[in-house]
Regions:
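Non-heme di-metal
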Residues: 1-172
């Protein structure tokens, strides 16, 4: 059977979207509960948010043949998604908001569109770096900072292993 184009595929997309939205919503609720002085309730919202994240991951994997695609594919997908958001979605939302008299919301849609444009550019640059083998080496000297311990190295390449905490090159 072919999943593509089926009602089950639509259901998987709906389930993924619903679980993803619930995760964010529960994270916001946890923050508010904590601010309101309810640590136990915040912890329960956070636990449930993590459960929802895992549920979303199940559906996302199923939509992608059972696994999460590789990093180059993910970078391209992310860039394409950001492109749609800033060139189409938010432009249309801003136009509608203006037509309906929601000027503040139109301004916010336009502002977020500009951020999404930057996101697209960042993802495309990262993809270019991955495809060109330039993630951990550059033409000129660069500051490389270990994301684990904060150690700084200046040079053309990130060290294979951090000389301070022994974390691998992937942390630079």
């Amino acid at each position: 059977m072919e999943l593509k184009g089926s009602k089950t595929e639509q259901n998987l997309m709906t389930a993924f979207a619903g679980e993803s939205q619930a995760r964010n919503k529960y994270t916001y609720f946890a923050s508010k509960a904590r601010k309101d002085g309810y640590e136990q309730i915040a912890a329960i919202f956070e636990e449930t948010a993590n459960n929802e994240k895992e549920h979303a991951k199940i559906w996302f994997k199923e939509l992608n043949g059972g696994s999460i695609p590789d990093t180059p594919a993910n970078l391209l997908s992310a860039a394409e998604g950001e492109n749609y958001e800033w060139t189409d979605m938010y432009q249309e939302f801003a136009k509608t908001a203006k037509e309906e008299g929601f000027d503040r919301l139109a301004y916010l849609f336009e502002g977020v569109a500009q951020i999404e444009k930057e996101h697209e550019e960042r993802y495309r640059k990262l993809l270019e770096n991955v495809e060109g083998g330039l993630v951990f080496s550059k033409d000129g000297d660069k500051i490389w900072k270990c994301r684990n311990c904060g150690h700084i190295v200046i040079g053309k390449e990130a060290p294979k292993v951090c000389p301070i905490c022994a974390h691998p090159q992937s942390y630079f």
